[in-house]
Amino acid sequence: MQVPYLEFDNVSKSFPGVKALQNISFKCYEGKVHALMGENGAGKSTLLKILSGNYLPSEGKLSIGGRQLVFRNTKEALLAGVAIIYQELNIVPEMTVAENLCLGQLPHSFGIVDKAELIERTQQYLDKLDLNISPNTPLKELSIGQWQMIEIAKALSRGAKIIAFDEPTSSLSAPEIEKLFSVINELRDEGKVILYVSHRMEEIFRISDEITVLKDGQFVETFSDLSKITNDDLVRSMVGRNLGDIYHYRPREVGDVRLKIAHLSGEKLQGDFSLTVRAGEVLGLFGLVGAGRSELLKVIFGADPCVSGSIELDGKTLSIRSPKDAIEQGIVLCPEDRKKEGIVPTASVGENINISARRLHNFFKFIINDKWEKKNAEKQRQQMNVKTPSIEQLIVNLSGGNQQKAILGRWLSEDIKVLLLDEPTRGIDVGAKSEIYDLIFKLADQKLAIIVVSSDLPEVIGVSDRIMVMRAHQITGVVERADATEEKVLKLAMVESLNVGD
């Protein structure tokens, strides 16, 4: 019988007013990929932070190689052979590949870096991962996928036996994902212990040997024979309902045309786009990488310059030269890159909610109306069901789903008519996705015109009244909800001929 190499035994972690983990117990084995799944807020990140030495457990034991260990800091975890490859990669773009790989462990003699040994050591690990990259290349010249490979090389150079991946494919292209999986398979064959955190079911089934599910900081179950379970089994384990139940689509009466785009193009939008969205309608935009969906939303929102065409709102032609113009007309955007463009990471939940409407409620122009801000932030927090101990909490401490709900709450402080959602559920767990879908339908019931861009085909079919399909900055077709199938929509996303209707 195989002996576990890594074991969590009744591990708990508490923060003031919050029990993040309660009695988590499971085992991981050498030469296996052990997936960790659960909704945002289930406790996955907290568990990784205990494993990496960022947090001390409040209770429970952690055993590695049969030895009970307590990591008081990240250095102790590294010395024990633990490496975490976080979603936010720990790299210095201005430094070279070699300098990043050996950061903190630069070979030196009499205080002078031994460059020859630095290059030789780096090349050894680049060769191991079959990376055709020069050790002298600055990281800023490489792709995110290559950055991730450097992080893996760094882990191997430090003798890591346990390697945990936190949402590793969220920013990778298809070829980069294939490369990552190839490397993970090699590490498994070498007897490494791999922990793999992801929301992507197809990845989990493809790469994992075992799956442990957490919910609300508690252990639910471990699946050891993946041939006997389905997507629905996993979803039920995580959220207590079937996969098909998460959309909750309901038909509604739509009004007159609210948003009309005619022959629109922009500096980064190399096409000629015309579309309409009615009050109370959800229009889905689907297309493969490079289709131009995000570029279209940014031109409508004024984030990218409009070159030609017109935008009408309720029959009135608008002049939108900036996001400020769009917001003042009632058009708002929740951007694709939530962390870079959607939130202010150094600000609280309340400040992020109020950041747009603040100008309407301040005394004069520069004096903040604290009473209104606190009341509004709390109101939107409750309306959006943002899970946070307090509106004073830094927004970066929230899960992706709760960050997205806070961004939606920001716009509900405005008098909005058109809501543009770019990949609204990217990096969000199944339970939080269902809440976002409910919010979309609730806003549609209030007669907002809504455009949803999504790369998730079941999602775009599940939430939309109509689906407009794009390819290479052209509209290739429009499909009514009643006629929408994955095959039909995907075919339109891959054809070259233009075949459009409003």
UniProtKB/Swiss-Prot annotation:
ATP binds at residues 38-45. GO terms for cellular component: plasma membrane. Residues 6-241, 252-497 form the ABC transporter domain. Its EC number is 7.5.2.12. SUPFAM superfamilies: P-loop containing nucleoside triphosphate hydrolases. It catalyses: L-arabinose(out) + ATP + H2O = L-arabinose(in) + ADP + phosphate + H(+). GO terms for molecular function: ABC-type L-arabinose transporter activity; ATP binding; ATP hydrolysis activity. Keywords: ATP-binding, Cell inner membrane, Cell membrane, Membrane, Nucleotide-binding, Repeat, Sugar transport, Translocase, Transport. It is an enzyme of class 7 (translocase). PROSITE patterns: ABC_TRANSPORTER_1, ABC_TRANSPORTER_2, ARAG. Disulfide bonds: none annotated. It is found in: Cell inner membrane. It comes from the Bacteria. Pfam families: ABC_tran. The complex is composed of two ATP-binding proteins (AraG), two transmembrane proteins (AraH) and a solute-binding protein (AraF). Part of the ABC transporter complex AraFGH involved in arabinose import. Responsible for energy coupling to the transport system. Belongs to the ABC transporter superfamily. Arabinose importer (TC 3.A.1.2.2) family. This is Arabinose import ATP-binding protein AraG.
